[in-house]
Swiss-Prot record:
Glycans are attached at residues 137, 192. Heterotetramer of TRAP-alpha, TRAP-beta, TRAP-delta and TRAP-gamma. Phosphorylated in its cytoplasmic tail. Keywords: Calcium, Endoplasmic reticulum, Glycoprotein, Membrane, Phosphoprotein, Signal, Transmembrane, Transmembrane helix. The chain crosses the membrane at residues 209-229. This is Translocon-associated protein subunit alpha. Residues 34-69, 267-288 are annotated as: Disordered. Pfam families: TRAP_alpha. Residues 230-288 are cytoplasmic. InterPro entries: TRAP_alpha. Residues 29-208 are lumenal. Seems to bind calcium. TRAP proteins are part of a complex whose function is to bind calcium to the ER membrane and thereby regulate the retention of ER resident proteins. May be involved in the recycling of the translocation apparatus after completion of the translocation process or may function as a membrane-bound chaperone facilitating folding of translocated proteins. It comes from Oncorhynchus mykiss.
Amino acid sequence: MFNFGSKILVLFLVAFPCGLISFGRVSADSESAEDIFPDSTVDEEEEEEEDEVLVEEDQVPGSETEDDIDEDAAVGDVTSHPDADTTIVFVTGEEFPANEIVKFLVGFTNKGSQDFTVHSLEASFRYPQDFQFYIQNFTALPLSTVVQPQKQASFEYSFIPAQPMAGRPFGLVILLNYQDSEGNGFQTAIYNQTVTIVELEEGLDGETIFMYIFLTGLVVLAVFGMYQVLESRTRKRFPVKVETGTGGMNGVDISWIPQETLNIMSKASASPKASPRKRTKRAVGVDQ
């Protein structure tokens, strides 16, 4: 009975979503059919409105074109001049360490026949996926330098990346703003690439010193343990020799000693040894 009820529940769970999907398709088909066959009066009204709009646009021809021209002019103000050539050289290298000074030189060459006035040099870090979003904007360097035709000028700029930016990529944008003798402003993107801020390894800190001390202690303990093991093995392998004196006269050459002395020595060794007290008492009794 329990198995039969579970089968019915499974069938219901499968059939219910299928019914909803089929019902949704039917309703969608009905709505699409209504969209395919609209009322003819609605089409006629839309056509009349479109004709009126076209007539109004023909009557006012210069309203939108003037705005477009102004926008194009505004965009044209920030473009570079064809007679201006720029170069960049990073003095501190292509790496950008965090919380360290980054210096670079910008070269400006006037290849035209009119003077150029270089106004400012600016740099900024931007979001890599969207260069319109500023992450860190540095102070613009005012220059106000006039570069004559067929002349060159170089400018130095430096900035310091923030410490929290270390280890992450950012878009570095370096812009040079200048104008010609007629007063038209121009802007050249000297550098516009994604760079990674590098985190420099600092000197010895507390953790590093503690690690070195710990490793030194381990090495000393290991050397001391090896020394103890080797010393114990050498003691077992080479027993200590104890020096003993001669136990007899076998290895001694006594041929040079007189015979009388040898007889006395043999008698002394054969007779029992008496203590000093007995000797003194015997000597005293003899004298009495």
